[in-house]
Design a protein with these regions (language model features):
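Extracytoplasmic/periplasmic solute-binding protein
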Residues: 187-200, 205, 229-289, 332
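Hinge/lid segment of periplasmic solute-binding proteins
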Residues: 79-83, 150-205, 220, 229, ...
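Short, well-ordered beta-strand elements
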Residues: 34, 85-96, 116-121, 144-145, ...
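Extracytoplasmic "Venus flytrap"/periplasmic binding protein-like
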Residues: 105-180, 212-223, 333-334, 349-352, ...
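Short, polar/charged alpha-helical segment
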Residues: 78-83, 96-118, 499, 517
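Glycine-centered hinge/linker elements that transmit conformational signals in sensory
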Residues: 232-233, 279-317, 358-367, 377-383
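Extracytoplasmic "Venus flytrap"
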Residues: 83, 87-105, 125-126, 203, ...
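C-terminal lobe and pocket-closing loops
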Residues: 343-352, 365-497, 501, 536-547
Length: 547
């Protein structure tokens, strides 16, 4: 959209006709003979008469000549006005530093191109959803645009708070919309066939492992969650980075009011969903009853709790930034995370595990839930039609990838500028670089970002590591049993409030596993009854593509 600076020199060639006397030294006079006609009186036969005669006369003259001279004049053309000169865009996102970093870094470049000033305002993640909702719902409209979790969009779209971006994107060739991977383009960015957000990030959970440790021990990367626990137990307490201190078999962030509540879905998913994406993992698609009071979710809670035995002693207080730092410091054999560790691990300034990190699709299970009995049953061709070597995988498209949305109540010129900024951030020239930098928190979401492995090699990955990292994400995207995030009205209350609280209390030993299950079940049912079961069920089925 904005590809260059408009400044140049206009060269004007002018043909000027100049009088020699005005353009050079005065010419030298010269004497010439001319013929003139004169009238004279003469005596003719004694009479005076007037006659006309022709005579030669010498005169001193100065000749006037015309000369042509080509003069080249250089004129500096005025730069065209920048389209958003004087416009300010207030963009709200979370503290980070990831996610906000590329917005802050590229904002001045966008200002140079367009004249618009980009102000990035940050708040803690736990406050972001409500801050956005309150600002628009109350008509305060302090913020013109937002970078947020696309699963929240339903609560902003239905009341008319978010700008519909469909027509803008259709008229914007620079965004190369068809290059955005179908899942992020057609699901994460869209609602009921209209586009409301611009992806800046692509999110899937993966498991990371130390390739050097597993190779030395003769172990394969984990295929099941039981494998994960066995590998974690094997390496826990060993010195994994050569500094003489014992390290950890598993590092998973579990701090409350952060982003920890998503992990339990990745663990529970392969036990619950086996019949394809439209089956879902959160609610019964016929009754909208929570899918937590069963052996599958109970098993997931047991696994979640056991991973803490092989983690740092303060794991319940760690956020994703903390566990990522531990992994790149060589202190963790395994970790569950989004795509960030893959790029953070190649940073020579912060990582001691360069070219020692592998990534795999999240582990699966050889047992799945019988939805009629609530019990776990073995995988077979019927119960697990998408199993690989007897293992049912259900990769979780958790969070959907940080995305940009625009306040529909903002001034038209500000909305134009905000769209231009998000388009600029999304365009390949910027995004293909940003997704290879660990500190951005942005993971690949364009098809070209998966196909062009050279960009990753140039960023510091070995060809094998790039293939491994991108392959794990591609395997997740291509899975027919992919798990979609919860996208019903007020999903934030179901997950970030009820689920997060119960998990943190369970992990801290404040409540038992069964009490945690009951607390989640009751909390979700209360929200559903308040909002209307039929409406919530229809929204849920619509989000799964099942209605």
């Amino acid at each position: 959209m904005f590809k260059g600076k408009y400044l140049g020199l206009l060269v004007v060639a002018a043909m000027l006709v100049l009088i020699a006397a005005q353009c050079g030294p005065p010419p030298t006079p010269e004497t010439i003979t001319v013929v003139e006609t004169v009238v004279v009186e003469k005596e003719v036969q004694g009479e005076t008469v007037t006659v006309v005669e022709t005579v030669e006369v010498e005169k001193e003259v100065v000749k006037e000549v015309e000369v042509e001279k080509v003069v080249t004049v250089e004129v500096e053309a005025a730069a065209p006005a920048k389209p958003f000169e004087g416009v300010e865009i207030n963009v709200l996102t979370f503290t980070g530093p990831q996610i906000a970093e590329p917005l802050q870094r590229r904002g001045p470049d966008f200002t140079e191109l367009t004249g618009a000033t980009v102000n990035v305002i940050i708040v803690p993640f736990s406050d972001l959803y409500q801050k956005i909702l309150t600002d628009m719902a109350t008509g305060t409209n302090s913020f013109d645009a937002f970078v947020f979790a696309p699963q929240w969009m339903v609560d902003y779209i239905v009341p008319g708070y978010l700008e519909d971006l469909t027509d803008r994107i259709a008229a914007d060739p620079d965004i190369e919309w068809e290059d955005v991977a179908p899942f992020f383009r057609d699901f994460s960015a869209s609602y009921e066939g209209r586009i409301y957000t611009i992806p800046l990030d692509g999110d899937f959970h993966m498991v990371y492992y130390r390739t050097d440790l597993l190779e030395e021990a003769g172990l394969e990367p984990p295929k099941t969650w039981d494998d994960y626990l066995e590998i974690a137990a094997t390496f826990h307490g060993q010195d994994l980075n050569g500094d003489g201190d014992p390290d950890y078999g598993s590092c998973i962030s579990k701090a409350r009011a952060q982003q920890s509540y998503w992990w339990i879905t990745s663990i529970a998913a392969p036990f619950i969903q086996s019949q394809g994406t439209s089956q879902g993992v959160f609610f019964d698609p016929e009754t909208f009853e929570p899918l937590v009071d069963n052996e599958a979710f109970a098993r997931a809670l047991d696994i979640y709790n056991e991973t803490s035995q092989y983690g740092p002693p303060d794991e319940l207080n760690l956020n994703v930034g903390d566990t990522r730092s531990l992994f790149t410091a060589g202190r963790c054999a395994l970790s569950l995370d989004w795509g960030d560790i893959g790029t953070l691990a190649i940073d020579p300034e912060t990582s001691v595990v360069q070219d020692k990190v592998g990534a795999v699709i999240t582990p699966g299970s050889t047992e799945v839930l019988d939805w009629e009995t609530g019990e776990l049953v073995p995988c077979d061709e019927t119960t697990c039609p998408y199993a690989i070597d007897g293992v049912n995988h259900a990769p979780f498209a958790s969070f959907g990838g940080w995305s940009g949305g625009i306040n529909a109540a903002a001034d038209d010129k500000v909305k134009d500028a905000a769209y231009a900024f998000f388009s600029y951030m999304n365009q390949p020239a910027q995004s293909n670089v940003d997704v290879t930098i660990g500190k951005t928190g942005y993971n690949p979401y364009r098809t070209s970002q998966f196909l062009n492995r050279q960009a990753w090699v140039e960023a510091g990955m070995s060809p094998q590591a790039a293939s491994n990292y991108l392959g794990a994400i591609e395997n997740s995207l291509a899975s027919p049993n992919m798990v979609l995030d919860l996208r019903v009205p007020q999903n934030q209350r179901y997950q970030q409030v009820v689920l997060d609280l119960a998990l943190s209390q369970f992990a801290a030993g404040e409540i038992t596993r069964d009490e945690a299950i009951q607390q989640i079940y009751d909390g979700w049912e209360e929200i559903t009854d308040e909002l209307g079961r039929e409406d919530q069920l229809n929204a849920y089925l619509g989000s799964l593509g099942a209605n």
